[in-house]
């Protein structure tokens, strides 16, 4: 089974939604899929649940596809408490940021958004 890790960095909702759409698409097609939320995209954690794509966000969360939210970036963007409230996996293994190396080691192809 192929493994895909999608890393969302951009802070625009349209870019984040495209990352979500692709994560779900790969998941539905049988890929082992991971979503890593980094950089400015962590700012959107407060907005996405009540957005037009909130239902998709809920499905992705329920399926356990969100594997990492950058602790340093979420703190900088003011959404760390929101990430914790949503029960998202917080990662600070790389000097406070999400560590991509374990995904590479585990054979994931990494796609950046």
For each feature predicted by the language model, list its residue ranges.
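Short hydrophobic segments within beta-strands
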Residues: 7-9, 36, 113
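Anion (oxyanion) recognition and catalysis
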Residues: 27-28, 61, 84, 104
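Histidine-anchored nucleotide/phosphate-binding helix
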Residues: 15-30
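Mid-chain, well-packed structural core segment of small domains
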Residues: 49-90
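C-terminal structural segments of small proteins and small subunits
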Residues: 80-113
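Short, glycine-/small-residue-enriched flexible loop/hinge segments at domain edges that mediate gating
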Residues: 30-47
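Residues at the starts of beta-strands that form the adenosine-phosphate
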Residues: 3, 31-34, 66
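Short, glycine-rich nucleotide/cofactor-binding loops
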Residues: 4-17, 42-48
């Amino acid at each position: 089974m192929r493994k895909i890790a999608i890393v969302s960095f951009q802070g625009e909702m349209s870019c984040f939604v495209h990352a979500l759409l692709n994560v779900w698409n790969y998941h539905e097609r049988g890929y082992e899929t991971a979503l890593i939320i980094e950089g400015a995209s962590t700012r959107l954690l407060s907005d996405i649940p009540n957005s037009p794509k909130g239902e998709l966000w809920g499905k992705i969360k329920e399926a356990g596809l969100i594997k990492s939210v950058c602790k340093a970036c979420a703190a900088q963007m003011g959404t760390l408490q929101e990430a914790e409230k949503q029960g998202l996996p917080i990662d600070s293994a790389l000097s406070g940021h999400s560590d991509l190396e374990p995904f590479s080691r585990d054979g994931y192809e990494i796609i950046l958004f």
